[in-house]
């Protein structure tokens, strides 16, 4: 039996009793003495006594018709009354918004303090992606909004980095560090907690590990992703560099060159230095269509050897343009690669020490240090983020059956300054199942819209937690609208003065924002608003890091805990120089020395 039919039968089953009762009344009317209606009604009581003397139902046709008709009429009355019933919601006539309390957040908190994401002083979210009750499952993506000085680092970033000792849910961190101060403050704690610490510094290249995106190219699609990230986050300066045709042509050029380097160059030449040299060696002449640059000759020889080569196919499409067009493309390409003319940048990206593909294998903290005033080198960070997410997703799928053994938390402070991560709106919707999460930290939601346009709303919708630390204007209005309205009681007192004085009292209900725009704009600096999907919002105290059990290991508590990045990198490189790889080969020479020669050597 279908569920709908079963539900219908159960709902109408009680009306069989009314079929019986109305049938008995029909039987009483039929058995009453008299030949017309008035006489029947006069003796109806006698008929009832006879009819109800026997409890068995009557199967007389007249009695059955009366029973069915009476029950049907009653069912129709109930149906009509239900349809036209007035709907009252007492106390919530204008809105049911309210602040959440301890009982609201309790199902989402892990009993073990270390197994939680710290959101406020009283609210936390378990790191468990598969809780016993699936209804309480939430992704670990957090959107943090707070203006300058609202404590985004102190009240959110640092408390969550101090959650680095969980044994049930080991976690790696990828942290953007504007100004480079955070690594010095928390680095010592991470080291003593068993973390590998990696650092990419785009402010001071001498205090950075090396990053080479070519080391993470494993297929043609990886080449396309790298080119796309480079195009999205750098600017060509040719007169037509912003036009779609020119960008597509430039994309073909980069794809061909990077594809050539990836598949044909020796390992030590797989870097941006080689790419820059190939661009510098490229040339197109409008007055000499037969002219061939050194790069043209390289691709011609490659085509003779392998006509179906990926790089050759891309370069042939690039050559379809006229000489003047190619000259414009080369100018734009040279301008886009201008940052690599700086020797320090080339040296930074000639080798790789970050080991991005292993961050989900063991506990690692990767600090991405960037300037908060200059975005010149932020395209490097965008490349790191883009490659990292794609590498971890592929590694989770190919090696670990879809889930990384170590959860990777990306805490992206000043997210708007990183640059655009291609397809981030799609990636953030799929990384949860791979044990990856992102905490997006902004000064205003308009920053997200400025970079990701229409995709900004998709990104924010995929964050199950929103933490609002402070804000004014449009930010405050958006938060106020999302919080909704509550129903309040209004009491008015009036007085009319004339020949006679009269007084009046008026009670009514009104709708009021749970927190108005001006209340949000003037919110106490120690307070914050937290929204968790499917839960009432919370108006709580910001997290006090001095009460965290591991606060004593930060340099905030004791200057002796300051982490010296320079010394750390120097020690790592010395250690690396002393280690001989098992794969390293040596030449062995067998020399036959005489006794006299041996004596001379010993002396």
Language-model segments: residues:
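Basic- and hydrophobic-enriched, low-structure N-terminal and domain-boundary segments
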Residues: 1-150, 154-162, 167-169, 496-497, ...
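Conserved long hydrophobic alpha-helices within structured protein cores
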Residues: 113, 119, 379-386, 479
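Conserved ATP-driven motor cores of ASCE-family P-loop NTPases powering translocation/secretion/packaging/pilus
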Residues: 428-529
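Short alpha-helical interface patches
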Residues: 49-53, 65-116, 220-230, 274-281, ...
């Amino acid at each position: 039996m279908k569920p709908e039919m079963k539900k219908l039968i159960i709902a109408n089953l009680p009306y069989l009793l009314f079929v019986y009762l109305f049938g008995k009344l029909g039987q009483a009317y039929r058995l009453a003495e008299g030949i017309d209606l008035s006489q029947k009604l006069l003796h109806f009581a006698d008929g009832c006594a006879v009819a109800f003397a026997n409890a068995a139902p009557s199967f007389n046709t007249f009695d059955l018709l009366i029973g069915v008709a009476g029950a049907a009429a009653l069912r129709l009355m109930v149906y009509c009354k239900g349809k036209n019933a007035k709907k009252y919601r007492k106390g919530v006539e204008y809105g049911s918004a309210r602040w959440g309390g301890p009982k609201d957040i309790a199902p989402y908190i892990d009993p073990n303090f270390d197994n939680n994401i710290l959101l406020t002083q009283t609210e936390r979210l378990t790191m468990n992606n598969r809780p016993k009750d699936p209804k309480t499952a939430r992704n670990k993506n957090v959107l943090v909004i707070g203006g300058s000085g609202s404590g985004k680092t102190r009240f959110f970033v640092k408390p969550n980095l101090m959650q680095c000792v969980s044994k049930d849910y080991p976690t790696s961190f990828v942290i953007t560090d504007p100004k480079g101060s955070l690594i010095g403050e928390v680095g010592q704690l991470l080291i003593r907690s068993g973390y590998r610490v990696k650092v990419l510094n785009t402010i001071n290249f001498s205090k950075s590990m090396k990053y080479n995106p070519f080391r993470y190219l494993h297929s043609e699609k990886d080449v396309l992703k790298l080119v796309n990230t480079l195009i999205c986050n750098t600017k060509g300066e040719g007169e037509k560099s912003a036009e779609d045709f020119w960008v597509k042509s430039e994309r073909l050029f980069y794809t061909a060159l990077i594809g050539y380097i990836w598949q044909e160059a020796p390992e030590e030449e797989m870097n941006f230095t080689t790419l820059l040299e190939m661009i510098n060696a490229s040339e197109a002449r409008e007055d000499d269509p037969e002219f061939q640059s050194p790069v043209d000759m390289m691709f011609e020889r490659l085509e003779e050897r392998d006509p179906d080569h990926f790089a050759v196919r891309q370069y042939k499409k690039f050559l379809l343009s006229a000489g003047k067009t190619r000259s414009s493309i080369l100018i734009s390409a040279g301008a886009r690669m201008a940052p690599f003319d700086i020797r320090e940048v080339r040296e930074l990206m000639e080798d790789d020490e970050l080991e991005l593909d292993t961050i989900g294998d063991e506990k690692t903290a990767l600090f991405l240090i960037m300037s908060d005033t200059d975005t010149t080198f932020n395209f490097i960070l965008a490349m790191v983020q883009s490659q990292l997410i794609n590498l971890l997703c592929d590694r989770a799928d190919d090696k670990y059956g879809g889930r990384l053994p170590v959860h990777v938390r990306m805490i992206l402070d000043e997210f708007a300054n990183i640059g655009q991560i291609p397809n981030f709106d799609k990636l953030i919707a799929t990384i949860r199942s791979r044990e990856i999460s992102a905490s997006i930290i902004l000064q205003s939601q308009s920053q997200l819209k400025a970079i990701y346009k229409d995709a900004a709303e998709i990104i924010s919708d995929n964050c199950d937690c929103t933490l609002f630390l402070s804000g004014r204007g449009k930010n405050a209005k958006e938060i106020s609208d999302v919080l909704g309205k509550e129903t309040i009681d209004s009491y008015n007192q009036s007085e009319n003065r004339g020949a006679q004085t009269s007084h009046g009292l008026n009670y009514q209900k009104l709708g009021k924002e749970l927190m108005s725009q001006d209340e949000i704009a003037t919110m106490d600096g120690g307070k914050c608003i937290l929204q968790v999907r499917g839960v009432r919002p919370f108006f709580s105290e910001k997290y006090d890091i001095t009460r965290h059990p591991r606060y004593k290991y930060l340099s905030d508590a004791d200057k002796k805990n300051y982490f010296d990045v320079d010394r750390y990198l120097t020690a790592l490189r010395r250690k690396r120089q002393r280690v001989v790889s098992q794969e390293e080969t040596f030449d062995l020479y067998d020399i036959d020395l005489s006794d006299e020669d041996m004596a001379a050597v010993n002396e």
